[in-house]
Curated annotation (Swiss-Prot):
Catalyzes the conversion of GlcNAc-PP-undecaprenol into ManNAc-GlcNAc-PP-undecaprenol, the first committed lipid intermediate in the de novo synthesis of teichoic acid. This is N-acetylglucosaminyldiphosphoundecaprenol N-acetyl-beta-D-mannosaminyltransferase. CDD domains: Glyco_transf_WecG_TagA. The keyword Transcription does not apply. Belongs to the glycosyltransferase 26 family. TagA/TarA subfamily. Disruption phenotype: Not essential. No teichoic acid in cell walls. GO terms for biological process: cell wall organization; teichoic acid biosynthetic process. The gene is tarA.
């Protein structure tokens, strides 16, 4: 099958990435409606933060790829703040890990199947174990994320499992590239890149304390506890510069 066409939700263009101006509650309803309609297409959800937007601005193929998603939601306060600066305010930030958890709640109620693809074998096994304890009505299966994009062996295994959800935790751009490379081999499936969420569910990494999330500075906490992320912080000022440049361009056009 193929990916559901872009939703008719109002769009907000942030440096070429077409975000859906939606809320967590609306996204939950969208996912429930997708299953209720029994569509044979797939629902591809991208949760984009400033780092992803930055990457997309310099990688045209990736930009075109994610703009084909059924929904693109703002995973990052930087994206929401940028939308306000550009006078196209997004309604809410929708953290990917929280949207994944909402999907799992739906799957639990409906006794659905979930495939976890990503991280190391040890981490994805631990994530599945932890989630199985929390959501016993879900049928889980998993595979580590250290595979080539063209690896058909894993695809065949997933097809045999017939999941309702495939959560891909390979990090961008690989997770979105994997989804769009293989999505036509699945049907009636919600597919979403979830970055490091599997590591959080596995207990290998901790999510930021509530106060960091409340203040919308979760990214600072992640950088403080994971030195590998320090180098990635440079994407924040680059993103801010690009937004300022886009704002000046809009002013000149008026």
């Amino acid at each position: 099958m193929t990916v559901e066409e872009r939703s008719n939700t109002a769009k907000v263009d942030i440096l070429g990435v077409d975000f859906d101006n939606t809320t967590m509650l609306q996204m939950v309803e969208n996912i429930k409606t997708f299953f209720a309609n029994q569509s044979t297409n797939n629902l591809f959800i991208v949760t984009a933060n400033p780092e992803i937007v930055n990457y997309a601005t310099t990688h045209q193929a990736y930009l075109e790829l994610i703009n084909q998603a059924s929904y693109i939601v703002a995973d990052g306060t930087g994206v929401v703040k940028a939308s306000h600066r550009l006078k196209q305010p997004l309604a809410h930030r929708i953290p990917g890990i929280e949207l994944m958890d909402e999907c799992l709640k739906i799957a639990h109620v409906n006794h659905q199947k979930v495939f976890l693809l990503g991280a190391t074998n040890e981490v994805v096994e631990a994530a599945q174990y932890a989630l199985q304890q929390r959501y016993p009505n879900i049928s889980f299966a998993h595979h580590h994320g250290y595979i080539d994009l063209e690896d058909e062996t894993v695809v065949k295994r997933i097809k045999l499992f017939k999941p309702d959800y495939i959560f891909v935790g390979m990090g961008f751009p690989k997770q979105e590239e994997w989804i769009m490379t293989h999505e036509n081999q699945f049907e009636s499936t919600v597919m979403m890149g979830v970055g490091g969420s599997l590591e959080v569910f596995a207990g290998a990494k901790k999510r930021a304390p509530y106060i960091f999330r409340k203040l919308n500075i979760e990214w600072i906490y992640r950088a403080l506890i994971d030195w590998k992320r320090i180098g990635r912080l440079k994407s924040i000022p680059i993103f801010m510069y690009k937004i300022a440049k886009a704002k000046r361009k809009i002013k000149k056009a008026k």
